[in-house]
Amino acid sequence: MAGYVVVGTQWGDEGKGKIIDVLSEKADYVVRFQGGNNAGHTVVVDGEKFILQLLPSGVLQAGTCVIGPGVVIDPKVFLDEIDRIEKRGAKTDHVIISDRAHVIMPYHIEMDKIRESVEDRIKIGTTKKGIGPCYADKISRDGIRMSDLLDLKQFEEKLRYNLKEKNEIFTKIYGLEPLDFDTIFEEYKGYAEKIKHRIVDTIPMVNKALDENKLVLFEGAQAMMLDINYGTYPYVTSSSPTLGGVTTGAGISPRKIDKGIGVMKAYTTRVGEGPFVTEIKGEFGDKIRGIGGEYGAVTGRPRRCGWLDLVVGRYATEINGLTDIVMTKIDVLSGLGKLKICTAYEIDGVIHEYVPADTKSLDRAIPIYEELDGWDEDITQIKKYEDLPVNCRKYLERVQEILGCPISVVSVGPDRSQNIHIREI
């Protein structure tokens, strides 16, 4: 069997979409295992950019694309995305949805907006797309699943029950107008009609493929430091984008995972609120943002930029049991002069080589840096590792040494062809 998992090792936006697109050329299945439409991933094919939110990055390849049980789905967003890429010539008949995946409802989106606007509440920087409230209903056993859309009587009962409770909250606590049952029911009845042919039990299908030694690629959204358990809580997402999340989010045994592939940007970025120890503020941070095009694929929000944080990198490598690292955007560092990598934090006089659980302590953390010589050459057209500038290779080798995990692929540009394969994945 060949189960490959691709995860982000930082705070997202590492370039997972591009790498998954490349790897999926040989994949029989590409399986999305968590998250929703709260993150965009970008795939560039022959200079043409595709921005995806719900669909797996492998949708532009021939393998079956699975939206797994651990994903939460806004049917409107799903259908809009299908329509958008079909209009650009892509086929989508190979896209299927797990009948166990949960459905984002209008009251989830409304609740998300309310919670983010409450004055005394910590501002997480949510995308306000209903992801968190949908997962909350899932955990409290009040969720509506894709299988419910195949049984309209059951869907009607669950919607009526949930809407009564949610409208009590909207009207009595927040003084808002109630949401209308008939409007929502008819809207989602229409969605059900359009997507019912895609809703299947994906678990036996994916496991059978693995048992037959087919290549199955598991794709996570967001990244390690946004994980609900191991990220910079509470500035995290509502699911587990780690390798461990694959087993519950796709319905497979951990014994069926052969490779853990961590995607790591050559510097660090973060969107929204939360601690960021290696953040570079001011003109130099703006320069990196400009060169790297560090703006949200969907929201357009500027990303915070900083030096490569290998405290985070080590943490991600260990927890995910990574076998390979894909280093992206190394080309952005060309011409920046001296480069820094963070190897430890100093917090209240104590050296930390691991990410502490106390998020507030990270606000006091002082990064301990190693400084390396940079390079000035344009490396975007280089195809062989040995052709990279000496200092670029030294940078990569030092990162690899600190992580204790091989860098197998280096990305030197946004197009799927701009990769240097050091060792086969």
Curated annotation (Swiss-Prot):
Cofactor(s) the protein needs: Mg(2+)
Positions with a binding annotation for IMP: 13-16, 38-41, 127, 141, 222, 237, 301
Binding site for GTP: 12-18, 40-42, 303, 329-331, 411-413
Entry note: cofactor: Binds 1 Mg(2+) ion per subunit.
Location of this chain's protein in the cell: Cytoplasm
Gene3D superfamilies per record: Adenylosuccinate Synthetase, subunit A, domain 1 (3.40.440.10), Adenylosuccinate Synthetase, subunit A, domain 2 (1.10.300.10), Adenylosuccinate Synthetase, subunit A, domain 3 (3.90.170.10)
Binding site for substrate: 297-303
A GO biological process held by the record: 'de novo' AMP biosynthetic process
Cellular component per GO, a single term: cytoplasm
Keyword Ligase: yes
E.C. no: 6.3.4.4
Active site: 13 (proton acceptor), 41 (proton donor)
Catalytic function, reaction form: IMP + L-aspartate + GTP = N(6)-(1,2-dicarboxyethyl)-AMP + GDP + phosphate + 2 H(+)
Record key words, sorted: Cytoplasm, GTP-binding, Ligase, Magnesium, Metal-binding, Nucleotide-binding, Purine biosynthesis
Similarity comment: family membership: Belongs to the adenylosuccinate synthetase family.
Function: Plays an important role in the de novo pathway of purine nucleotide biosynthesis. Catalyzes the first committed step in the biosynthesis of AMP from IMP.
Subunit: Homodimer.
Protein name (database record): Adenylosuccinate synthetase
Species lineage: Bacteria, Fusobacteriati, Fusobacteriota, Fusobacteriia, Fusobacteriales
